[in-house]
């Protein structure tokens, strides 16, 4: 996959044999490819820092929810926690989508339960 997306030099070979960590440094970037073949997220880690798979999975959970619902996820959000109704959704439209209502923090910040529960 790294070769397919040109993350390694063209002459890097077809296997990892003979390559060092320095040769593979460009693969320190994590890409999440959406179903439409576009990059949905990329995170680049220094060679000295391990990847945080919990964060990668959290971001994927967020992207899946926000693709299906008119929501956004707040900072430090975890699956199952409240989400934000995107500002472009009017209150009238929100009443149809969320008949049980929502918590209003600011006019542009309305929270509802995670629809994926």
Q: Where do the protein language model's features map onto the residues?
A:
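Chalcogenol-based redox active-site neighborhoods
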Residues: 1-117
């Amino acid at each position: 996959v790294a070769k397919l997306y040109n993350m390694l030099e063209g002459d890097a070979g077809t296997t990892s044999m003979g390559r060092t960590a320095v040769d593979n440094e460009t693969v320190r970037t994590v890409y999440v490819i959406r179903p439409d073949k576009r990059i949905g997220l990329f995170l680049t880690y220094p060679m000295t820092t391990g990847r945080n798979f919990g964060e990668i999975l959290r971001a994927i959970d967020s992207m899946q929810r926000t693709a299906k619902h008119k929501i956004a996820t707040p900072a430090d959000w975890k699956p199952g926690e409240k989400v934000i109704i995107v500002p472009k959704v009017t209150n009238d439209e929100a009443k149809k989508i969320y008949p049980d209502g929502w918590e209003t923090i600011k006019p542009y910040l309305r929270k509802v339960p995670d629809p994926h529960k």
